[in-house]
From Swiss-Prot:
Optimum temperature is 80 degrees Celsius. Optimum pH is 6.5, thermostable up to 85 degrees Celsius, at 90 degrees it loses about 50% activity. One of its GO terms (cellular component) is phosphopyruvate hydratase complex. Coiled coil: none annotated. Pathway: Carbohydrate degradation; glycolysis; pyruvate from D-glyceraldehyde 3-phosphate: step 4/5. This is Enolase. Its EC number is 4.2.1.11. The keyword Metal-binding applies. Binds a second Mg(2+) ion via substrate during catalysis. It comes from Chloroflexus aurantiacus (strain ATCC 29366 / DSM 635 / J-10-fl).
Amino acid sequence: MSTLIEAIVAREVLDSRGNPTIEVDVRLESGDVGRAIVPSGASTGAHEALELRDGDKSRYNGKGVLKAVQAVNEDIAEALIGFDAADQIALDQELIALDGTPNKSKLGANAILGVSLAAAKAAAAAFGLPLYRYLGGVYAHVLPVPMMNIMNGGQHATNSTDFQEFMIMPVGAESFREGLRWGAEIYHMLKKVIHDRGFSTTVGDEGGFAPSLPTNDAPLQLIMEAIEKAGYRPGEQIVIALDPATTEIFEDGKYHLKREGRSLSSAEMVDYWVDLVNRYPIISLEDGLAEDDWEGWALLRAKLGDRVQLVGDDFLVTNVQRLQRAIEAKAANSILIKLNQIGSLTETLSAIQLAQRSGWTAVVSHRSGESEDVTIADLVVATNAGQIKTGAPARTDRIAKYNQLLRIEEELGSAARYAGRSAFKV
């Protein structure tokens, strides 16, 4: 059985928004093949690795990825054919060196990540192992609590709230299967609640409902009603997570809440979150402040860090250097993990390990532009991270990850453990 790379082929495919993205196949001398499709985001952090797009307005409004495809089929293939796919760290180091830029702008983080993931999948297949076991070893056994984005606003919807995501987390369930069922039942009840109030039940990019609502906490009121009407206890069985994506509403040193007609300073924004946490069972707040508001983040943690998981997404961009700085500055206490923010599997695993060693939590996440690729489901189990953020229980691009987790839980049998409330350090 040889795990040496025999061929690497990339192609342009479509993501869940109908935009082009890159798919990569890596074939080994053993005949085993790994395939990966790279996701893309709508609200992207300024410090993310660069997603290479063509910029040719005559194709896909400039969003084509033929340059990234060419980078894989020519530069990367030439460098990696004959390379051992089982040597993941060396392979990723070779890709990073081949690019030679700080943000992967030469070859594109999308090109590099596609090869990085496809190689790992090919190696796992060659060893006859599921991806979670190949990456995580014998101790990979924790099924995550899903962060289910059941109401969308901000960049993921139009004419909705200032804030991007309102999520539920079934922390009181006994298993992932049960937690998923609870979430799905609440999701369907929420649709009825929204419909009965005369609002639209159209969905956003991640499957959550996106009605036009009068205030920013109106979605929380509707979600609380749906939880109770579905027969569950808020704060005990079901808790709430928010991703307001405040970088999107931050300008000239202020947070502009257009739905409420006011602009807030960093300190006022922190007080805003304290008030919401006092009124609703919110356990997790992601990007509660803008990506470079370091002083604000430290204040947020000082005021809420012992009660709420404070997740850095645009703030930390799965980047070890930014994470290390945040740990030292006591800004945030959790990191969102998005493979394509940093652009390689090894760097992603390094960020998760640093967070866990530092007593932080790590939340493995999708992007708003997704596909049928289920890598993140295996990654979250491989790292025992305990939390996954992959949308509403709707749309195949989201459901694919949940279904993969159901399969993994079944395969693990009695060894499987659902993270539940122990997923949190607060």
